[in-house]
């Protein structure tokens, strides 16, 4: 079993950053393990569990993150309500998962825009609007027709990569 997950964050300005993540996985032998690379922390716009699976996989995520709304305060009779900063990001993801016996699977990817609201130091509320792309060869991925449509909207609660 070989697995690697490399991440780098480069500051572009005082409030913006470029985030990149590279992931690779290989498992061989009589009973190789499988890895899933779909979902919000992998290939955005593709299913989270059981569809983009393989004993060999690689993935690249890239994102440019920047603030959209830095301060929002709403007044009420009970006092002001301060909201945290709203950030946006342009993203691009690409990857492939291959089972040992099936090497003809497509290279999958997605691109789009993401909006996020930090909920404390570790949690984030995120909305992704994007487009899927591939070479059209979905054989072996078990994706239904709606999961092959180009456009997607996805809501996520969790953490950033």
Indicate residue ranges for each PLM-predicted region.
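Short basic (Lys/Arg) and small-residue
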Residues: 93
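C-terminal outer-membrane beta-barrel translocator/porin domains of Gram-negative envelope proteins
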Residues: 1-90, 98-100, 138-148, 155-161
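C-terminal beta-signal and terminal closure region of outer-membrane beta-barrel proteins
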Residues: 102-161
């Amino acid at each position: 079993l070989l697995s690697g997950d490399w991440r780098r964050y480069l500051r572009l300005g005082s409030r913006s950053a470029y985030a990149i993540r590279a992931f690779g996985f290989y498992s061989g032998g009589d009973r190789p393990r499988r890895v899933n690379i779909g979902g919000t922390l992998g290939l955005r716009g593709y299913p989270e569990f059981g569809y983009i699976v393989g004993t060999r996989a690689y993935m690249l995520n890239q994102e440019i993150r920047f603030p959209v709304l830095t301060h929002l305060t709403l007044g009420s009779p009970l006092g002001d309500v301060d909201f945290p900063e709203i950030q946006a990001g342009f993203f691009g993801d690409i990857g492939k998962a291959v089972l040992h016996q099936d090497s003809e699977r497509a290279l999958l990817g997605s691109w789009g825009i993401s909006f996020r609201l930090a909920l404390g130091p570790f949690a984030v509320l995120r909305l992704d609007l994007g487009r899927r792309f591939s070479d059209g060869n979905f054989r072996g991925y078990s994706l239904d027709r709606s999961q092959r449509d180009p456009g997607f909207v996805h809501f996520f609660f969790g953490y950033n990569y």
